[in-house]
Amino acid sequence: MARTKCKTKTVANPRTGVRKTAKDLSEPVRQDAVSRRRPTTLPFVGNTSSRPRVFYDVLAKKNVVFPNVKAEYHYRVRNAPKIDPKNFGTTLPICYSSIGPAKTLELRPLGRLPPHIIKALNDHYVQLTRGSMVPAADLYNNGDHPAEQRIPTMLNENEYLRLIQELEEEEKSKQFSATSSSAPHVNPYSAQHLVNGEIIGIFVIYGTGLVTRAVCSQTREMFTAHVLPEWKASKVIDVIRRLQIPTDISSMTADEIRLSELCISKRMEIIKSNDRYILMNPCESATIHSYATERLDEITENDVMSIYQKVVEIVRFCHSRKVILQNFKPRSFYLKKDAHNKWVVRPCFLQDMSCEEDQSEAQFTRRSVCVPFMAPEMLTAESRTHHSYSTELWGLGVLLYILLTGKYPFHENSMPLLFRTIKFKQHRWPFNFISSKSRNIVNMLLKKAPATRMNLEDLWNQVNGDFPEIRCRSNIILKKQDMIVKMDLFEMYYNTYKDRLLPKNVLPMYEEMKACRNDSTILTEMAKRDFRSIQEQMKRRIETKPTEYQTLVMQVRLQQINQLFFEKEVSQAQKQHRAPRLVQLKCSDISKELLLPGDIYPISEHYHPSQQPVDKVVYKLLSDANSLAFPTVMKGTVPKSYPPPVFKGLDISPS
């Protein structure tokens, strides 16, 4: 019998690019499932002890799973959440400096790359690290809600026409379904729900439910539409009357008028349609939650307190009008910046507010309070007034704790355990760099007994002070994990595209990879040390109050530094033929290790001027002028002189 030669047909996998024959495809599914399994060679943030890392073999193409790894990376990049760098708070996370002073993109090798490559790297990095860079029960990975996306506040003409076209197509499909012989479609919503495409006055409803979006057909502005029960509509109207500007504004101050306009917008409307009361409130593109999510662990304590100060100001105004906010979730406050680059905060949900005398009614029982924000007295069976001014202070404390640390002060997997934790357990602070001033504010607000909590006026006086420019959510462990992901990411991109792209598009990746390797060595050394000692040194540097003699020494040293700055500026101005610009530093701008000698202020073993941007400039100025020694100071009638300081900390300045 003559043998017939059988041709094998090859099939290409669209994702991996690997070609398989029909014989291979006819094999058991077990091997193909193993090949499609998510590879373990991807960068993993967390416990890496149980996951082998064979990146170097993969990048050198010595491993057979390289096509699968590359396909998985490309798949993640395509499905990564996009970040718009034009909006505030959306600085590309791939461009953050892990340690040392923050650097703008123009000062780093990444700044020489084309924008599309930077965006690809950033989307890749965000997909790999979001939700893994912070511990469980955090602000942006708590599992209660999906990730909050930015929404437009104003639709252009094309977007509005596209919306109307989608609504018309949906209406046609509904009419076709109604006239067809198939089974009728049952509306799962009640008559109180808003329906997508419904027109109410000049508003077009966008979405379905009790809370949806609405677009004004005249201005194309985006609103939030809330369906109010009949009993609640009258209560909301009472709140509006108390907060809005009266006809005679002579009795109100300028701040009260400004706060009234923030709480009650002039474009807000309450419309009655089909026995429904609908509250139309103009919305903003960002909330405190979205801003904190975008900044991740790069947010500083000063940023947090500047936003929190605006929230406290809103609460003070509402309490002065006998109105209680009730809802203190970060999602419940819109956030934007005004023309003067200052924060503007206003409440999102007016329907959650209530008047003081309404709290005894059963309809308001725990309706507008999220469980993690409940005060201990609200969880008792004999409680009659479920919300009061003291519970407002507790909610403010929970909000500040979330903004400072990125997670809830009380978190459990079940409601009974959460209730018991709130009532009986004390909150704990993570090993982050948070000043004791902010900790004391939270501790005084989260007192179990309502009578022992800080009152609102004392809180207002406390939040108006100065706070350090230190990343309050950051610690050495997180930064080390962040550096590992960046180093592997840059290395893979460089080895993958160095033979395919122009040198100018791959050499910056190699330089960033080398910088990550240098920083990784520093982070590894810092992580070996006792983290508590680093934290204590940080706290002591921030919070120690100097004595009178220390203040005198600091002022003399500061005069020396400002004089050197002035002389340097004058010489540069003469060379550039311009007027000199006056540079005046304050004592709060410079670390005490540079302002005070080691004899009267012990220098931390972990401190070096290169670790702070201002200290680095001042130290270089003093070194260039050969003026590291302290000037003579009179201690009573005795002149005192001190030698130059000696720093034993790690120098992180680039070599």
Curated annotation (Swiss-Prot):
Where does the UniProt annotation locate this protein? Answer: Nucleus
Organism per entry: Caenorhabditis elegans
**PROSITE patterns recorded for this chain?**
PROTEIN_KINASE_DOM (PS50011)
Q: Which UniProt keywords apply?
A: ATP-binding, Nucleotide-binding, Nucleus
Q: Which GO terms describe its molecular function?
A: ATP binding; DNA-binding transcription factor binding; mitogen-activated protein kinase kinase binding; protein kinase activity
Where do the record's region annotations for Disordered lie? 1-35
Q: Which Pfam families match?
A: Pkinase
Q: What is the lineage of its organism?
A: Eukaryota, Metazoa, Ecdysozoa, Nematoda, Chromadorea
Name the UniProt record assigns to this protein: Protein nipi-3
Gene deletion effect: Arrested development at the second to third larval stages (L2-L3) and lethality between 5-10 days after hatching. Small and dumpy body morphology at the second to third larval stages (L2-L3), abnormal pharyngeal morphology, sterility. Growth and fertility defects are suppressed in a cebp-1 mutant background. Lethality is suppressed in several mutant backgrounds, including tir-1, or kinases nsy-1, sek-1 or mak-2. Levels of phosphorylated, active p38/MAPK pmk-1 are significantly increased. Increased levels of cebp-1 mRNA in multiple tissues.
Q: Where is the composition biased (Basic and acidic residues)?
A: 21-35
Q: Which family does it belong to?
A: Belongs to the protein kinase superfamily. CAMK Ser/Thr protein kinase family.
Subunit info here reads: May interact with transcription factor cebp-1 (via N-terminus).
Q: What is known of its domains?
A: The protein kinase domain is predicted to be catalytically inactive.
Claim: Nucleus is one of the keywords in the record: yes
